[in-house]
């Protein structure tokens, strides 16, 4: 495969601070202006395929689906540049980034989606993940500019530019070490101008700069701003205050020690630093929180946003040759940089470290201890958080933080939580704390007074809602069983995705709907029956009783297909309309009525909320569907949903050829 060579001219034309930045909103503006005259649009290719044809007299040889970070759009590439296409077709595939230098639009008739035709482009890069901003998920544009008329997003979507690595490094070096001012020229034919700066004497070293009162400048001794730290800046040196220092973590399973700390410079930018094993011990004893240091040397890598909430794209791994020197200067404590996410939006950041500004609505009076599945004794304390988004979310404190937390310091107060992690369980969302979490009571930042005003004036009249992946529930447009199967719904999420279907039970086996479970509170392990006793391997004890529990598998069918689903616990109880114990008693006392209970469930249309997830079993990937809830069909709402689907389908171009 041929490589992509980027010239200095191309780099200078399209880079933004050394990175490739997409032209967010390009699709909308091109539709409004019927092309994009005089402007190049930097977009990413999501799909690409050779396809020779003609539309409205316009010949094309290639089809691509472009994304500007906000909108996606199907686009044709003109046959007029077929020679370029043949040279670069291997690159015009998913992940490539191009600059569209010439674009024309044409319509195939009233009510038909406007077509894009690229007549000029420059190939910039390849092999990128699909780019998007955390707060915006790219979506297909309908082709109707009126829907988003005037929309000009102020959103940055960018990535590193590997093909321009050498040019980027030179650019970063020039940014951190600007060239010295040029000497004024001598006046022709005689004495130098009286404004001329005398030339330095040969072989004399430059005098060191005078000491700065508030620490060295960004260019002194090669120091660069933390914001400029990237893998392409060689021999970097930064200066800042250690704003956070964690304890050394021991990982016995890997025989490893890890030490993390964060350093913040005078601009308020922060970067995370990590050291391992002997290096971790060395730097942990050297570094003190709230003191300033110079740091040089180390490997720069992509930040893992699951454990890093500094806001920096990169983090530093310290090596044996890394140098950390005391700064000597007392720097002002950096301002709290809170990248706030509203509670109503935490579902979009599941598994990531985020910041929230909230009011504690309720809190456990005391911490509680419990034993984990691994046999460890853990301590936790839960609280309920609210904000102006009218969402209510539970947060869990762990360990010492749970024990020392004082209700009077939290309840009804504005609190900033920096570095909490949203987690999903059975469709509901909560927040968890970790070693990287900071708790700041009544922080001095913008938004505090507004949040408290909302709490005192509007909150008493607001309806608070728990955040749930299923909160859309049966109100969202239903899908079909065949549609869920064909699109492998749930494959894009480790936790699975939720969908509603209108379907009926067409097959169920009463004999396997229940099992005998452990009678201990909170345990659902299947027991082993022997000599009149019931042994639970999980609890490691035998009892003279058990409890009935649901584990139902049954076939759901609609007009498009069938699928086997599983229902447990409360979800299964909603399906049957009885508790597992009630049905179990029927099995013991009246087997005919027991069987009739399940027969009555069949061939009755219901609205089902299903959790779909892809799982691997015996090296085969399968789609597993689990019942979350079930309701009677609200015919009026169902008809309304179908009408909405019909409206959404109007004007959608058939994309099967892409």
UniProtKB/Swiss-Prot annotation:
As part of the heterotrimeric replication protein A complex (RPA/RP-A), binds and stabilizes single-stranded DNA intermediates, that form during DNA replication or upon DNA stress. It prevents their reannealing and in parallel, recruits and activates different proteins and complexes involved in DNA metabolism. Thereby, it plays an essential role both in DNA replication and the cellular response to DNA damage. One of its GO terms (molecular function) is single-stranded DNA binding. Belongs to the replication factor A protein 1 family. One of its GO terms (biological process) is positive regulation of nematode male tail tip morphogenesis. Its main location: nucleus. A zinc finger (C4-type) spans 518-539. Signal peptide: none annotated. InterPro entries: Euk_RPA1_DBD_C (IPR047192), NA-bd_OB-fold (IPR012340), NA-bd_OB_tRNA (IPR004365), Rep_factor-A_C (IPR013955), REPA_OB_2 (IPR031657), Rfa1 (IPR004591). Residues 236-326 bind DNA. This is Probable replication factor A 73 kDa subunit. Component of the heterotrimeric canonical replication protein A complex (RPA). SUPFAM superfamilies: Nucleic acid-binding proteins. Residues 134-155, 169-222 are annotated as: Disordered. GO terms for cellular component: DNA replication factor A complex; nucleoplasm; nucleus. Keywords: DNA replication, DNA-binding, Metal-binding, Nucleus, Zinc, Zinc-finger. Disulfide bonds: none annotated. Gene3D superfamilies: Nucleic acid-binding proteins. It is found in: Nucleus. It comes from the Eukaryota.
């Amino acid at each position: 495969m041929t490589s992509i060579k980027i010239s200095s001219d191309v780099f200078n034309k399209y880079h933004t601070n050394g990175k490739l930045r997409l032209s967010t909103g390009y699709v909308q503006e091109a539709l409004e202006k019927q092309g994009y005259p005089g402007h190049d649009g930097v977009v990413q290719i999501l799909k690409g395929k050779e396809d020779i044809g003609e539309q409205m007299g316009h010949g094309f040889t290639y089809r691509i689906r472009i994304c500007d970070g906000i909108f996606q759009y199907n686009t044709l590439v003109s046959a007029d540049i077929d020679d370029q296409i043949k040279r670069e077709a291997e690159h015009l595939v998913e992940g490539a980034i191009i600059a569209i230098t010439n674009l024309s639009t044409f319509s195939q008739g009233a009510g038909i989606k406007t077509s894009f035709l690229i007549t000029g482009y420059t190939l910039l890069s390849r092999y990128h993940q699909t780019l998007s901003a955390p707060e915006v998920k790219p979506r297909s544009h309908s082709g109707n500019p009126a829907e988003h008329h005037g929309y000009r997003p102020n959103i940055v979507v960018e990535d590193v530019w590997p093909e321009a690595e050498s040019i980027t490094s030179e650019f970063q070096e020039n940014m951190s070490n600007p060239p010295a001012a040029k000497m004024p020229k001598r006046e022709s034919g005689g004495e130098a101008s009286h404004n001329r700066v005398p030339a330095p004497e040969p072989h004399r070293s430059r005098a060191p700069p005078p000491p700065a009162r508030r620490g060295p400048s960004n260019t002194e001794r090669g120091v660069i701003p933390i914001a400029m730290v990237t893998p392409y800046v060689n021999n970097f040196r930064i200066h800042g205050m250690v704003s956070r220092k964690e304890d050394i973590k021991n990982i016995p399973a890997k025989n490893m020690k890890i030490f993390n700390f964060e350093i913040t410079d005078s601009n308020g930018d922060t970067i995370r630093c990590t050291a391992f094993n002997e290096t971790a011990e060395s730097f942990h004893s050297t570094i003190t929180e709230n003191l300033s240091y110079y740091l040089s040397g180390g490997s720069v890598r992509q930040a893992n946003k699951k454990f890093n909430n500094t806001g920096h794209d990169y983090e530093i791994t310290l090596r044996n040759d890394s140098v950390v020197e005391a700064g000597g200067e007392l720097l002002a404590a950096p301002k709290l940089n809170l990248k706030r996410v509203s509670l109503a939006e935490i579902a979009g950041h599941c598994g990531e470290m985020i910041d929230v500004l909230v009011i504690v609505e309720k809190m456990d009076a005391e911490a509680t201890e419990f034993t984990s599945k691994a046999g460890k004794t853990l301590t936790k304390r839960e609280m309920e958080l609210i904000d102006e988004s009218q969402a209510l979310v539970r947060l869990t404190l762990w360990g010492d933080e749970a024990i020392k937390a004082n209700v009077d310091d939290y309840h009804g107060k504005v609190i900033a939580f920096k570095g909490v992690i949203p987690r999903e369980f059975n469709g509901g969302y909560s927040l968890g704390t970790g070693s990287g979490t900071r708790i700041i009571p009544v922080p001095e930042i913008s938004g505090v007074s507004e949040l408290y005003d909302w709490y005192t004036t509007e909150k008493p009249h607001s309806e608070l809602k728990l955040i749930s992946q299923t909160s859309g529930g049966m109100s969202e447009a239903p899908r079909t069983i065949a549609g869920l199967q064909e699109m492998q719904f749930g494959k894009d999420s480790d936790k699975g995705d939720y969908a509603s279907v209108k379907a009926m039970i067409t097959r169920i086996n009463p004999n396997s709907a229940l099992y005998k479970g452990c009678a201990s509170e909170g345990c659902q392990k299947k027991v082993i029956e022997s000599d009149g006793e019931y042994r639970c391997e999980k609890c490691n004890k035998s009892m003279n009783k058990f409890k009935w529990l649901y584990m139902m598998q049954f076939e759901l069918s609609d007009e498009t297909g069938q699928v086997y689903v599983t229902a447990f616990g409360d979800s299964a109880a909603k399906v049957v309309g009885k508790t597992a114990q009630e049905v179990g008693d029927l099995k013991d006392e009246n087997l005919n009525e027991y069987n009739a209970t399940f027969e009555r469930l069949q061939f009755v249309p219901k609205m089902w909320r299903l959790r779909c997830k892809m799982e691997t079993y015996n090296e085969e990937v399968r789609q597993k569907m689990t019942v979350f809830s079930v309701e009677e069909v609200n015919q009026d709402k169902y008809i309304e949903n179908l009408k909405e689907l019909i409206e959404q389908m109007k004007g959608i171009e058939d994309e099967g050829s892409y």
